[in-house]
Amino acid sequence: MSWWWAGAIGAAKKKLDEDEPSQSFESVALIIGVTGIVGNSLAEILPLSDTPGGPWKVYGVARRPRPTWNADHPIDYIQCDVSDAEDTRSKLSPLTDVTHVFYVTWTNRESESENCEANGSMLRNVLQAIIPYAPNLRHVCLQTGTKHYLGPFTNVDGPRHDPPFTEDMPRLQIQNFYYTQEDILFEEIKKIETVTWSIHRPNMIFGFSPYSLMNIVGTLCVYAAICKHEGSPLLFPGSKKAWEGFMTASDADLIAEQQIWAAVDPYAKNEAFNCNNADIFKWKHLWKILAEQFGIEEYGFEEGKNLGLVEMMKGKERVWEEMVKENQLQEKKLEEVGVWWFADVILGVEGMIDSMNKSKEYGFLGFRNSNNSFISWIDKYKAFKIVP
């Protein structure tokens, strides 16, 4: 049985066959956003000995110098700012052996029109630096997300689809940088008839990356650690409807597995796929798990005290500095490890459920237990000394 069918945490065999002699590579991956929450999972899974389509050679691209928590992955790390067309061309066009592109990065701007411009330009820069120069290019994976059906974060009162979300739902008649990215992908990829594509739309992602702009698990770990340090109850900062309502999440390893499946399986070509754990949960249940993982006895939802993390974490910078020193954590500022605005968005809504039927019908049967997934990523933030 393929590891993407196993559905367990760590389904991909986390083992490199170090004793094998050097070998030629069947596939060559280029991960754009390798230090991000899914990029980090791709960098761990692609080089494994049993990964489909392999053996894989892996290039990993990120804007910043390589962090210590990413350093063990056997990849060729390239520091490159893909928002800079010249930097992108000079560093990526020499990679003539690339066969597969995994585009899993994004940037955030103040308005959606600026998001469309910035994110569209980044994707175009990458594709124009690779497509004309990589004669063996076979496939491009583009990661977007559930906002395809909801619109941008600012679309509070605007049009949105009713869940469960399915891939055949039409685009909303609003600006959305995901739509811009799709259009650019289609425009650039049609220049080479032999290159195929897939689009992946994960829900809220459970994964590991201190650099991620949408890092819900890491952010909640930091909040819980501060509550534990101060002896405060772990109060749910979001809305009652989010506390009580059904939600779904996407394990970062599962997303990586789906992208690899789509990259190598002929039945998955030129299609868009939702990606979630194929189960549902309530925050009221995960909150108990979060409290247990940090040894907090008093926790829950209290009406009137759900002020949001942006408000609740004001003035906690000195507290975090003390915690970093006391626990010998990685020296990161509070604003680097706690994405409060994003957590407030996520913990203020409910019912963002998308269907996995299409993905299963096409042959991807991977899944995760969201409770176990949540715990496994909490453990990783502790192991890498992001939180105590």
Swiss-Prot record:
pH-activity dependence text: Optimum pH is 8.0.
The family database entries (Gene3D superfamilies) matched by this protein are listed as: NAD(P)-binding Rossmann-like Domain (3.40.50.720)
- Catalytic activity annotated for this protein? 5beta-cholestan-3-one + NADP(+) = cholest-4-en-3-one + NADPH + H(+); 4,5beta-dihydrocortisone + NADP(+) = cortisone + NADPH + H(+)
Expression (tissue specificity): Expressed in roots, stems, leaves, flowers, seeds and siliques. Expressed in the vascular bundles.
| Keyword hit for Acetylation | yes
Instruction: Tell me the PANTHER family matching this sequence.
Output: 3-OXO-DELTA(4,5)-STEROID 5-BETA-REDUCTASE (PTHR32487:SF0)
What name does UniProt use for this protein? 3-oxo-Delta(4,5)-steroid 5-beta-reductase
